[in-house]
Curated annotation (Swiss-Prot):
The modification N-acetylmethionine is found at residue 1. Residues 163-284, 326-449 form the MI domain. This is Programmed cell death protein 4. The modification Phosphotyrosine is found at residue 152.
Length: 469
């Protein structure tokens, strides 16, 4: 080893002036540099010591440069915890050498989450890490005892009159489509109605007056289900009081409003959401003609219910809820009343109130049957005028009219057994309907006809047979 070091010194002789730059750097090693110069000038230091000093200085520079970067990788300190380098050089333990060291003094840090650490950039801590509950410092100058045990909840402002009508009108109109009272109740609970609870029946009744009979039935059912959950019986009484006061204005848009409001009152008393003495409390105190008519209508309906008539039938069952037999009877009664009165508008109104546009072909069928069974011309002409009016007003559609005629065409052989002249009457009626524009030419051509029987004296083609004598 000494021989190799001597050869190295001979090849690269050490320059005393540049020794400080090659061996040490920094102010902390300035004293050691001057001592080495003196020792070299004294010519008593060995070559092996110089080489060892160079290696130690190089290791110290590397350690100082990579101390903060390589502190957690174990490149500088051995695995057994000793302060010895893998090359065998001892790590300097000078307090001044650790002054600018960024490594944690305890080896593990303070245990706090680091921003940009395991959770990612800008995240404090790893995902799912649970921190301790922050305890309130009572001695904190900003401490407020009112902030402890606070419960926060969303506060909905009460609706004013304008917002009330704007918010509830779509809800009630949508209810007329789906008929789910529970959904309406849930939506009303989310609103802060406040003192406007009594306005719910008023708005519902006013919208139902402009609708159909089925809408009024649904409104009565809605009021019955909402009473006790969203509003009380006193709210219902206040609402009907307001409806009676508003009857003069309601009658301008709906002339039948007094009778309809009376039916609503009778139904409410029957459902138990109005007390039985509600109508009696108005006796002798009503000056409005419309309000008096509404109360009289309610009194009549309630007196009829005592005789066994159900109060649920004040509106009837609308639309598809009715049975086929019931609809057939209603249409038959409608046609008979029309033949007696001759009022086409009333017949059209009664047909619309049935709310069965898919069953209008039954009216066409029954009307033609009456024509075939009649013996005079009045029924023929009145039924023709009725079908013409219903066709022009689009009350009966093309498909319903066509279906009614096709039913007659298919059943005319059986009808002819009871009505011998049905074929000829049907041909004449179909031709008149075509001339009036009620049916198309194609539908007219489908009308069945029965061939005329030839007499015995008629030959082929209608020619008379020549006499054989």
């Amino acid at each position: 080893m000494d021989v190799e070091n001597e050869q190295i010194l001979n090849v690269n002789p050490a320059d005393p002036d540049n020794l400080s730059d090659s061996l040490f750097s920094g102010d902390e090693e300035s004293a050691g540099t001057e001592e080495i110069k003196n020792e070299i000038n004294g010519n008593w230091i060995s070559a092996s010591s110089i080489n060892e000093a160079r290696i130690n200085a190089k290791a110290k520079r590397r350690l100082r440069k990579n101390s903060s970067r390589d502190s957690g990788r174990g490149d500088s300190v051995s695995d057994n915890g000793s302060d010895t380098l893998r090359s065998g050089v001892t790590v300097p333990t000078s307090p001044k050498g650790r002054l600018l060291d960024r490594r944690s003094r305890s080896g593990k840090g303070r245990g706090l989450p680091k921003k940009g650490g395991a959770g990612g950039k800008g995240v404090w801590g790893t995902p799912g890490q649970v921190y301790d509950v922050e305890e309130v410092d009572v001695k904190d100058p900003n401490y407020d005892d009112d902030q402890e045990n606070c419960v926060y909840e969303t506060v909905v402002l009460p609706l004013d009159e304008r917002a009330f009508e704007k918010t509830l009108t779509p809800i009630i109109q949508e209810y007329f489509e789906h008929g789910d009272t529970n959904e309406v109740a849930e939506m009303l609970r989310d609103l802060n109605l406040g003192e406007m609870k009594s306005g719910v029946p008023v708005l519902a009744v006013s919208l139902a007056l402009e609708g159909k009979a089925s809408h009024r039935e649904m409104t009565s059912k809605l009021l019955s289900d909402l009473c006790g959950t969203v509003m009380s019986t006193s709210d219902v009484e206040k609402s009907f009081d307001k409806s009676l006061k508003d009857l003069p204005e309601l009658a301008l848009d709906t002339p039948r409003a007094p009778q309809l409001v009376g039916q609503f009152i009778a139904r409410a008393v029957g459902d138990g959401i109005l007390c039985n003495t509600y109508i009696d409390s108005y006796k002798g105190t009503v000056d409005c003609v419309q309000a008096r008519a509404a109360l009289d209508k309610a009194t009549v309906l309630l007196s009829m219910s005592k005789g066994g008539k159900r109060k649920d039938s004040v509106w009837g069952s609308g639309g598809g809820q009715q049975s086929v037999n019931h609809l057939v009877k209603e249409i038959d009664m409608l046609l008979k009343e029309y033949l007696l009165s001759g009022d086409i508008s009333e017949a059209e109104h009664c047909l619309k109130e049935l709310e069965v546009p898919h069953f209008h072909h039954e009216l066409v069928y029954e009307a033609i049957i009456m024509v075939l069974e009649s013996t005079g011309e009045s029924t023929f002409k009145m039924i023709l005028d009725l079908l013409k009016s219903l066709w022009k007003s689009s009350t009966i559609t093309v498909d319903q009219m066509k279906r009614g005629y096709e039913r007659i065409y298919n059943e005319i052989p059986d009808i002819n057994l009871d009505v011998p002249h049905s074929y000829s009457v049907l041909e004449r009626f179909v031709e008149e309907c075509f001339q009036a524009g009620i049916i198309s030419k194609q539908l007219r051509d489908l009308c069945p006809s029965r061939g005329r029987k030839r007499f015995v004296s008629e030959g082929d083609g209608g020619r008379l047979k020549p006499e054989s004598y």
